[in-house]
Amino acid sequence: MEQGVALIRDLIRDVPDFPKPGVVFKDITPLLSDPRAFAYCVQALAGRFADEGVDKVIGVEARGFIIAAPVAYHLGAGFVPVRKKGKLPGAVYSYTYDLEYSTDTLEVHQDALAGGERVLVVDDVLATGGTALATKQLAEQLGARTVGFGCVLELGFLGGREKLAGVEGMEIEALVKV
């Protein structure tokens, strides 16, 4: 396991001043192009939640889709995309949440989850925790119950773990923490 984490850590690239000056973006695309690292991410997250009885895995737009879909496959679960406002056709539930200087809205199809289903939320990064909580709220609007949150990278200095601490069904599995 330590070798897998080291491989992932080595492949995450810092991109200074992206998307704006002063921000150091953590780019996971080199990790995705490495078959060993990508396989490790998927297998480690699926393994961590294998005993949770996951019915569906929710992937958060956009890079969360890349990790969540194969995790769902490994768990024998369905995959549900959560997208930004206006990107899903048909009837949706929406949840608007606060960002540092603005708001954002996530949406899910109204028929994506059934009452009582156990869902795992997967994204590429845990930053402030706002997107994770918004996704949990969407799942609950459909009557589902979250069983955890999995991600490749946790940006600990942004406080997402603290925000999710004590939130039922949002136990965190982050493969790499910085």
PLM feature spans:
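PRPP-associated nucleotide enzymes
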Residues: 1-178
